Protein backbone atom coordinates (compact mmCIF):
# COMPACT_ATOMS: atom_id res chain seq x y z
CA UNK A 1 0.00 0.00 0.00
CA UNK A 2 1.43 3.38 -1.02
CA UNK A 3 1.83 5.86 1.81
CA UNK A 4 0.34 9.21 0.84
CA UNK A 5 2.63 12.13 1.67
CA UNK A 6 2.11 15.89 1.32
CA UNK A 7 3.03 17.28 -2.08
CA UNK A 8 6.19 19.37 -2.35
CA UNK A 9 6.09 22.09 -5.02
CA UNK A 10 9.10 23.45 -6.90
CA UNK A 11 8.52 26.30 -9.33
CA UNK A 12 10.38 26.45 -12.63
CA UNK A 13 10.32 30.24 -12.85
CA UNK A 14 10.51 30.80 -16.60
CA UNK A 15 9.67 34.27 -17.91
CA UNK A 16 7.07 32.72 -20.21
CA UNK A 17 4.99 29.71 -19.21
CA UNK A 18 6.39 28.90 -15.74
CA UNK A 19 5.31 25.59 -14.27
CA UNK A 20 5.44 23.43 -11.15
CA UNK A 21 7.35 20.28 -10.33
CA UNK A 22 5.16 18.44 -7.80
CA UNK A 23 6.72 15.67 -5.68
CA UNK A 24 5.02 13.29 -3.26
CA UNK A 25 4.18 9.63 -2.62
CA UNK A 26 0.74 8.85 -3.99
CA UNK A 27 1.04 11.74 -6.43
CA UNK A 28 -0.07 9.61 -9.36
CA UNK A 29 -3.55 9.24 -7.87
CA UNK A 30 -3.69 13.04 -7.64
CA UNK A 31 -2.52 13.72 -11.22
CA UNK A 32 -5.93 14.81 -12.51
CA UNK A 33 -6.43 17.30 -9.69
CA UNK A 34 -2.90 18.64 -10.11
CA UNK A 35 -3.58 19.26 -13.79
CA UNK A 36 -6.75 21.14 -12.88
CA UNK A 37 -4.78 23.14 -10.32
CA UNK A 38 -2.28 23.96 -13.09
CA UNK A 39 -5.10 25.54 -15.08
CA UNK A 40 -5.91 22.75 -17.52
CA UNK A 41 -9.64 22.64 -18.32
CA UNK A 42 -11.38 19.42 -17.32
CA UNK A 43 -13.02 18.72 -20.67
CA UNK A 44 -9.73 18.40 -22.57
CA UNK A 45 -8.71 15.30 -24.51
CA UNK A 46 -5.59 13.59 -23.19
CA UNK A 47 -3.35 10.97 -24.77
CA UNK A 48 -1.29 9.08 -22.18
CA UNK A 49 1.87 7.53 -23.63
CA UNK A 50 3.61 4.81 -21.66
CA UNK A 51 5.58 1.58 -22.04
CA UNK A 52 4.56 -1.95 -20.96
CA UNK A 53 6.69 -2.11 -17.80
CA UNK A 54 5.11 1.10 -16.51
CA UNK A 55 1.59 0.87 -17.94
CA UNK A 56 1.00 -2.49 -16.27
CA UNK A 57 1.45 -1.35 -12.64
CA UNK A 58 0.58 2.35 -13.01
CA UNK A 59 -1.57 2.87 -16.10
CA UNK A 60 -4.92 2.34 -14.37
CA UNK A 61 -4.10 4.73 -11.53
CA UNK A 62 -3.10 7.40 -14.05
CA UNK A 63 -6.17 6.92 -16.27
CA UNK A 64 -8.58 6.76 -13.33
CA UNK A 65 -7.19 9.96 -11.83
CA UNK A 66 -7.55 11.80 -15.14
CA UNK A 67 -11.08 10.51 -15.80
CA UNK A 68 -12.22 11.35 -12.28
CA UNK A 69 -11.04 14.91 -12.92
CA UNK A 70 -13.18 15.08 -16.06
CA UNK A 71 -10.65 14.47 -18.83
CA UNK A 72 -11.33 12.33 -21.91
CA UNK A 73 -8.42 9.88 -21.95
CA UNK A 74 -6.79 7.42 -24.35
CA UNK A 75 -3.73 5.25 -23.63
CA UNK A 76 -0.94 4.37 -26.05
CA UNK A 77 1.60 1.75 -24.97
CA UNK A 78 4.85 1.75 -26.94
CA UNK A 79 8.19 0.00 -26.73
CA UNK A 80 10.59 2.47 -25.18
CA UNK A 81 14.14 1.21 -25.31
CA UNK A 82 16.91 3.41 -26.65
CA UNK A 83 16.63 1.55 -29.98
CA UNK A 84 13.00 2.71 -30.27
CA UNK A 85 13.86 6.37 -29.67
CA UNK A 86 13.40 7.21 -33.35
CA UNK A 87 11.26 9.35 -35.67
CA UNK A 88 9.30 6.19 -36.52
CA UNK A 89 8.12 5.83 -32.91
CA UNK A 90 7.18 9.51 -32.79
CA UNK A 91 5.10 8.90 -35.93
CA UNK A 92 3.35 6.11 -34.02
CA UNK A 93 2.47 8.62 -31.30
CA UNK A 94 1.23 11.05 -33.96
CA UNK A 95 -0.98 8.31 -35.41
CA UNK A 96 -2.49 7.73 -31.97
CA UNK A 97 -2.99 11.48 -31.55
CA UNK A 98 -4.91 11.54 -34.82
CA UNK A 99 -7.05 8.56 -33.79
CA UNK A 100 -7.75 10.19 -30.41
CA UNK A 101 -8.79 13.40 -32.23
CA UNK A 102 -6.33 15.53 -30.29
CA UNK A 103 -6.84 19.23 -30.92
CA UNK A 104 -4.63 22.21 -30.16
CA UNK A 105 -6.27 22.44 -26.74
CA UNK A 106 -5.53 18.76 -26.01
CA UNK A 107 -2.59 17.35 -24.07
CA UNK A 108 -0.21 14.43 -24.03
CA UNK A 109 0.94 12.84 -20.77
CA UNK A 110 4.29 11.03 -20.68
CA UNK A 111 4.10 8.22 -18.11
CA UNK A 112 7.47 6.50 -17.97
CA UNK A 113 11.20 7.01 -18.06
CA UNK A 114 13.38 9.39 -20.02
CA UNK A 115 12.83 7.76 -23.40
CA UNK A 116 9.03 7.97 -23.08
CA UNK A 117 9.34 11.55 -21.85
CA UNK A 118 11.67 12.63 -24.65
CA UNK A 119 9.57 11.07 -27.40
CA UNK A 120 6.20 12.17 -26.02
CA UNK A 121 7.51 15.69 -25.51
CA UNK A 122 8.78 15.81 -29.08
CA UNK A 123 5.52 14.37 -30.41
CA UNK A 124 3.60 17.05 -28.50
CA UNK A 125 5.94 19.77 -29.76
CA UNK A 126 5.31 18.75 -33.37
CA UNK A 127 1.62 17.76 -33.31
CA UNK A 128 -0.51 20.59 -34.73
CA UNK A 129 2.60 22.80 -34.36
CA UNK A 130 2.65 22.19 -30.63
CA UNK A 131 0.25 21.02 -27.92
CA UNK A 132 0.83 20.83 -24.18
CA UNK A 133 2.57 17.94 -22.46
CA UNK A 134 2.60 16.77 -18.84
CA UNK A 135 5.60 14.78 -17.65
CA UNK A 136 5.05 11.96 -15.12
CA UNK A 137 8.51 10.37 -14.75
CA UNK A 138 8.79 6.91 -13.21
CA UNK A 139 12.58 6.41 -13.23
CA UNK A 140 15.09 8.15 -10.99
CA UNK A 141 16.97 9.55 -13.98
CA UNK A 142 13.82 11.06 -15.47
CA UNK A 143 12.71 12.44 -12.10
CA UNK A 144 15.90 14.35 -11.39
CA UNK A 145 16.82 15.34 -14.94
CA UNK A 146 15.01 14.42 -18.15
CA UNK A 147 11.46 15.46 -17.19
CA UNK A 148 12.42 19.01 -16.17
CA UNK A 149 13.52 21.65 -18.62
CA UNK A 150 11.72 20.97 -21.88
CA UNK A 151 14.40 19.12 -23.82
CA UNK A 152 12.70 16.64 -26.14
CA UNK A 153 13.93 14.58 -29.04
CA UNK A 154 14.96 11.34 -30.67
CA UNK A 155 18.20 9.75 -31.80
CA UNK A 156 19.79 9.78 -35.23
CA UNK A 157 22.19 7.07 -36.45
CA UNK A 158 24.95 9.70 -36.28
CA UNK A 159 24.32 10.70 -32.69
CA UNK A 160 22.07 10.88 -29.66
CA UNK A 161 19.22 13.41 -29.50
CA UNK A 162 20.24 15.14 -32.73
CA UNK A 163 16.57 15.58 -33.70
CA UNK A 164 14.56 17.51 -31.14
CA UNK A 165 13.02 20.69 -29.78
CA UNK A 166 12.67 22.69 -26.59
CA UNK A 167 9.08 22.18 -25.41
CA UNK A 168 8.41 22.96 -21.76
CA UNK A 169 5.82 20.84 -19.92
CA UNK A 170 2.65 22.25 -18.39
CA UNK A 171 3.35 20.23 -15.23
CA UNK A 172 5.83 17.68 -13.89
CA UNK A 173 4.47 15.21 -11.34
CA UNK A 174 6.92 12.97 -9.48
CA UNK A 175 5.59 10.07 -7.42
CA UNK A 176 8.59 8.50 -5.63
CA UNK A 177 6.58 5.36 -4.85
CA UNK A 178 6.91 4.36 -8.53
CA UNK A 179 10.60 3.74 -7.84
CA UNK A 180 9.58 0.68 -5.82
CA UNK A 181 9.12 -1.31 -9.03
CA UNK A 182 12.11 0.18 -10.87
CA UNK A 183 14.80 -2.40 -11.73
CA UNK A 184 17.93 -1.91 -9.61
CA UNK A 185 20.11 -1.25 -12.66
CA UNK A 186 17.81 1.59 -13.74
CA UNK A 187 17.89 3.09 -10.25
CA UNK A 188 21.68 3.01 -10.22
CA UNK A 189 21.73 4.70 -13.63
CA UNK A 190 19.68 7.56 -12.19
CA UNK A 191 22.19 8.01 -9.38
CA UNK A 192 24.72 9.21 -11.96
CA UNK A 193 22.63 12.33 -12.50
CA UNK A 194 22.26 12.84 -8.74
CA UNK A 195 26.04 12.64 -8.29
CA UNK A 196 26.35 15.11 -11.16
CA UNK A 197 24.43 17.73 -9.17
CA UNK A 198 26.91 17.27 -6.33
CA UNK A 199 29.79 18.06 -8.68
CA UNK A 200 27.96 20.99 -10.27
CA UNK A 201 27.30 22.91 -7.09
CA UNK A 202 25.82 20.94 -4.20
CA UNK A 203 28.90 19.96 -2.20
CA UNK A 204 26.74 18.96 0.77
CA UNK A 205 24.81 16.51 -1.41
CA UNK A 206 28.06 14.96 -2.65
CA UNK A 207 29.34 14.57 0.92
CA UNK A 208 26.02 13.15 2.11
CA UNK A 209 26.20 10.49 -0.60
CA UNK A 210 29.82 9.75 0.31
CA UNK A 211 28.73 9.12 3.90
CA UNK A 212 25.95 6.73 2.83
CA UNK A 213 27.05 3.07 3.12
CA UNK A 214 24.97 2.03 0.09
CA UNK A 215 23.70 4.74 -2.29
CA UNK A 216 22.91 2.17 -4.99
CA UNK A 217 19.34 1.27 -3.91
CA UNK A 218 16.29 3.05 -2.46
CA UNK A 219 16.58 0.88 0.66
CA UNK A 220 20.25 1.77 1.05
CA UNK A 221 19.48 5.47 0.84
CA UNK A 222 16.39 5.33 3.04
CA UNK A 223 13.06 7.05 2.41
CA UNK A 224 14.01 10.35 4.04
CA UNK A 225 17.31 10.72 2.19
CA UNK A 226 15.72 9.66 -1.11
CA UNK A 227 13.00 12.29 -0.72
CA UNK A 228 15.66 14.90 0.01
CA UNK A 229 17.68 13.83 -3.04
CA UNK A 230 14.66 14.15 -5.33
CA UNK A 231 13.75 17.58 -4.03
CA UNK A 232 17.31 18.96 -4.09
CA UNK A 233 18.07 17.58 -7.54
CA UNK A 234 14.80 18.83 -9.03
CA UNK A 235 15.31 22.25 -7.43
CA UNK A 236 18.86 22.44 -8.83
CA UNK A 237 17.64 21.59 -12.33
CA UNK A 238 14.77 24.10 -12.01
CA UNK A 239 17.13 26.92 -11.02
CA UNK A 240 19.44 26.34 -13.97
CA UNK A 241 16.58 26.02 -16.46
CA UNK A 242 14.91 29.19 -15.17
CA UNK A 243 18.18 31.10 -15.61
CA UNK A 244 18.93 29.72 -19.09
CA UNK A 245 15.94 28.05 -20.71
CA UNK A 246 17.47 27.17 -24.08
CA UNK A 247 21.07 26.45 -23.15
CA UNK A 248 22.60 29.73 -24.24
CA UNK A 249 25.22 29.63 -21.50
CA UNK A 250 24.68 28.43 -17.91
CA UNK A 251 22.44 25.48 -18.75
CA UNK A 252 25.31 23.85 -20.61
CA UNK A 253 26.78 22.84 -17.23
CA UNK A 254 24.02 20.21 -17.01
CA UNK A 255 25.90 18.37 -19.77
CA UNK A 256 28.64 17.43 -17.32
CA UNK A 257 29.71 13.89 -18.22
CA UNK A 258 27.45 13.86 -21.28
CA UNK A 259 30.01 14.76 -23.95
CA UNK A 260 32.05 11.61 -23.45
CA UNK A 261 28.91 9.77 -22.30
CA UNK A 262 27.14 10.29 -25.62
CA UNK A 263 30.24 8.98 -27.41
CA UNK A 264 30.03 5.80 -25.33
CA UNK A 265 26.32 5.37 -26.08
CA UNK A 266 26.71 6.02 -29.80
CA UNK A 267 29.84 3.96 -30.49
CA UNK A 268 28.97 1.02 -28.24
CA UNK A 269 25.47 0.89 -29.73
CA UNK A 270 22.29 2.24 -28.17
CA UNK A 271 21.12 -0.11 -25.46
CA UNK A 272 24.56 -1.48 -24.55
CA UNK A 273 24.75 1.05 -21.73
CA UNK A 274 21.88 2.80 -20.01
CA UNK A 275 22.10 6.57 -20.37
CA UNK A 276 23.06 7.08 -16.73
CA UNK A 277 25.75 4.40 -16.97
CA UNK A 278 27.26 6.15 -19.99
CA UNK A 279 27.13 9.49 -18.14
CA UNK A 280 28.96 7.90 -15.20
CA UNK A 281 31.72 6.72 -17.54
CA UNK A 282 31.74 10.17 -19.13
CA UNK A 283 32.11 11.89 -15.75
CA UNK A 284 35.17 9.79 -14.96
CA UNK A 285 36.59 10.51 -18.42
CA UNK A 286 36.18 14.28 -18.25
CA UNK A 287 37.54 14.17 -14.70
CA UNK A 288 40.68 12.54 -16.07
CA UNK A 289 40.86 15.22 -18.77
CA UNK A 290 40.61 17.94 -16.10
CA UNK A 291 43.41 16.31 -14.08
CA UNK A 292 45.55 16.13 -17.22
CA UNK A 293 44.98 19.86 -17.84
CA UNK A 294 45.75 20.72 -14.22
CA UNK A 295 42.34 22.20 -13.43
CA UNK A 296 41.27 19.42 -11.02
CA UNK A 297 43.12 17.54 -8.33
CA UNK A 298 43.78 13.82 -8.49
CA UNK A 299 42.24 13.52 -5.00
CA UNK A 300 38.92 14.99 -6.15
CA UNK A 301 38.94 12.83 -9.27
CA UNK A 302 39.36 9.75 -7.10
CA UNK A 303 36.58 10.89 -4.75
CA UNK A 304 34.28 11.14 -7.74
CA UNK A 305 35.32 7.72 -9.02
CA UNK A 306 34.79 6.09 -5.61
CA UNK A 307 31.32 7.60 -5.21
CA UNK A 308 30.30 6.50 -8.70
CA UNK A 309 31.53 2.98 -7.96
CA UNK A 310 29.74 2.93 -4.58
CA UNK A 311 26.51 3.70 -6.45
CA UNK A 312 27.08 0.53 -8.48
CA UNK A 313 27.94 2.37 -11.69
CA UNK A 314 30.63 1.60 -14.29
CA UNK A 315 33.77 3.73 -14.46
CA UNK A 316 35.99 1.93 -17.00
CA UNK A 317 36.38 3.43 -20.47
CA UNK A 318 35.33 0.94 -23.17
CA UNK A 319 37.65 -0.30 -25.92
CA UNK A 320 37.02 2.33 -28.60
CA UNK A 321 39.37 3.56 -31.31
CA UNK A 322 40.69 7.08 -30.82
CA UNK A 323 39.68 8.08 -34.36
CA UNK A 324 36.11 6.92 -33.79
CA UNK A 325 35.94 8.87 -30.53
CA UNK A 326 37.26 12.05 -32.16
CA UNK A 327 34.81 11.75 -35.05
CA UNK A 328 31.91 11.19 -32.68
CA UNK A 329 32.91 14.18 -30.56
CA UNK A 330 32.84 16.46 -33.60
CA UNK A 331 29.19 15.53 -34.15
CA UNK A 332 28.27 16.57 -30.61
CA UNK A 333 25.44 19.11 -30.25
CA UNK A 334 27.64 21.29 -28.05
CA UNK A 335 30.12 22.11 -30.83
CA UNK A 336 30.18 25.89 -31.45
CA UNK A 337 31.99 27.32 -34.47
CA UNK A 338 33.82 24.04 -34.86
CA UNK A 339 35.05 24.11 -31.24
CA UNK A 340 33.96 21.38 -28.85
CA UNK A 341 32.84 22.54 -25.42
CA UNK A 342 33.55 20.45 -22.33
CA UNK A 343 32.04 20.96 -18.88
CA UNK A 344 35.19 20.59 -16.78
CA UNK A 345 35.28 20.06 -13.00
CA UNK A 346 37.44 22.42 -10.97
CA UNK A 347 36.46 21.09 -7.54
CA UNK A 348 33.74 19.15 -5.75
CA UNK A 349 30.90 21.60 -6.32
CA UNK A 350 32.34 23.71 -9.13
CA UNK A 351 32.74 23.41 -12.90
CA UNK A 352 33.69 25.56 -15.87
CA UNK A 353 32.92 25.39 -19.59
CA UNK A 354 36.00 25.19 -21.80
CA UNK A 355 36.27 25.31 -25.57
CA UNK A 356 40.07 25.22 -25.77
CA UNK A 357 40.65 21.48 -25.37
CA UNK A 358 43.08 20.33 -28.04
CA UNK A 359 43.00 17.15 -30.08
CA UNK A 360 46.28 16.14 -28.46
CA UNK A 361 44.82 16.55 -24.95
CA UNK A 362 41.86 14.35 -25.85
CA UNK A 363 44.20 11.69 -27.26
CA UNK A 364 46.36 11.83 -24.12
CA UNK A 365 43.25 11.49 -21.97
CA UNK A 366 42.11 8.44 -23.94
CA UNK A 367 45.53 6.84 -23.44
CA UNK A 368 45.28 7.44 -19.69
CA UNK A 369 41.80 5.94 -19.61
CA UNK A 370 43.08 2.79 -21.29
CA UNK A 371 45.58 2.30 -18.49
From Swiss-Prot:
Binding site for NAD(+): 114-118, 138-139, 151, 160, 178-181
Cofactor annotation comment: Binds 1 divalent metal cation per subunit. Can use either Co(2+) or Zn(2+).
Catalyzed reactions: 7-phospho-2-dehydro-3-deoxy-D-arabino-heptonate = 3-dehydroquinate + phosphate
GO cellular component, one term: cytoplasm
Enzyme's top EC category: lyase
Signal sequence extent: none
GO molecular function, one term: nucleotide binding
Keywords: Amino-acid biosynthesis, Aromatic amino acid biosynthesis, Cobalt, Cytoplasm, Lyase, Metal-binding, NAD, Nucleotide-binding, Zinc
Protein name (Swiss-Prot/TrEMBL): 3-dehydroquinate synthase
Organism in which the protein naturally occurs: Synechococcus sp. (strain CC9605)
Amino acid sequence: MTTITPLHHIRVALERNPYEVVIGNGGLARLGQQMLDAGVQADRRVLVVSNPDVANPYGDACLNSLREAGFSVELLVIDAGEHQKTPATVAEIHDAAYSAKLERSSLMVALGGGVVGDMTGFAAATWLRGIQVVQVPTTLLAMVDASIGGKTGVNHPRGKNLIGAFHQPRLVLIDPSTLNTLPEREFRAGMAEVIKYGILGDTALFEELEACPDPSTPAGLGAERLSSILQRSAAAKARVVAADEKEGSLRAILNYGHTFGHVVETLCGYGTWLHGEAVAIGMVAVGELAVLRGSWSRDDAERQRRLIESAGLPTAWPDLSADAVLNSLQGDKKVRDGRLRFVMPTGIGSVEIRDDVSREEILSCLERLKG
